[in-house]
Amino acid sequence: MSRVGKLPITIPEGVKIGLNDLEVKISGPKGELSKTFKGNIAISLAENKLLVKPLAANKNARAMWGTARSIISNMVTGVKEGFKLKLEINGVGYRAMVKGKYLNLMLAKSHNTKIEIPSDIKIEMPKQNIIILEGTDKEKLGQFASIIIKQRPPEPYKGKGIKFENQCIPRKEGKKN
């Protein structure tokens, strides 16, 4: 029995939910999200609570049960409050700028890296070495953050690179003579 899947999702005020078989549409003050689920699950709405139940007793149905419940819960939180990720850029001369709909990264390469910003993600830059990402879809936000981090992941000797705000980088000792 899924400990996550059996919990009901309470729907806060200002959030509307539309169910069409396995398609869930959620709209709120921050925007609208929709997702179609595949698998052996049933989604029902009763008294301001959303319930997810498995249709079969096999391993795949139980796995999708908890996953679907977590995804729907994140969608509800996203349209109500939104999600925020903070990235730090460490290194001499490493910085970022937003130009139009592109994020321009200067990361000690022979060229600047341009990454197109998705339409549903907002970028704020209080400093040149801090990037704050905001959006309603937690999955897309994390995916975009990983694309940015992949351009220059943090290295263990000096800690240079792009990392999440409170991410701990295990440090290694350098060469000894």
Curated annotation (Swiss-Prot):
Keyword Transmembrane helix on entry: no
Keywords: Ribonucleoprotein, Ribosomal protein, RNA-binding, rRNA-binding
Pfam hit, one: Ribosomal_L6
Keyword Zinc among record annotations: no
GO CC entries: ribonucleoprotein complex; ribosome
Record-linked InterPro entries: Ribosomal_uL6-like (IPR000702), Ribosomal_uL6-like_a/b-dom_sf (IPR036789), Ribosomal_uL6_a/b-dom (IPR020040), Ribosomal_uL6_bac-type (IPR019906), Ribosomal_uL6_CS (IPR002358)
Domain of life the protein comes from: Bacteria
SUPFAM superfamilies to which the protein is assigned, alphabetical: Ribosomal protein L6 (SSF56053)
GO molecular function, one term: structural constituent of ribosome
GO biological process, one term: cytoplasmic translation
Subunit structure of this chain's protein: Part of the 50S ribosomal subunit.
Physiological role: This protein binds to the 23S rRNA, and is important in its secondary structure. It is located near the subunit interface in the base of the L7/L12 stalk, and near the tRNA binding site of the peptidyltransferase center.
NCBIfam families to which the protein is assigned, alphabetical: L6_bact (TIGR03654)
Family the entry assigns: Belongs to the universal ribosomal protein uL6 family.
Full protein name: Large ribosomal subunit protein uL6
Highest classification ranks of the organism: Bacteria, Pseudomonadati, Pseudomonadota, Alphaproteobacteria, Rickettsiales
Gene: rplF
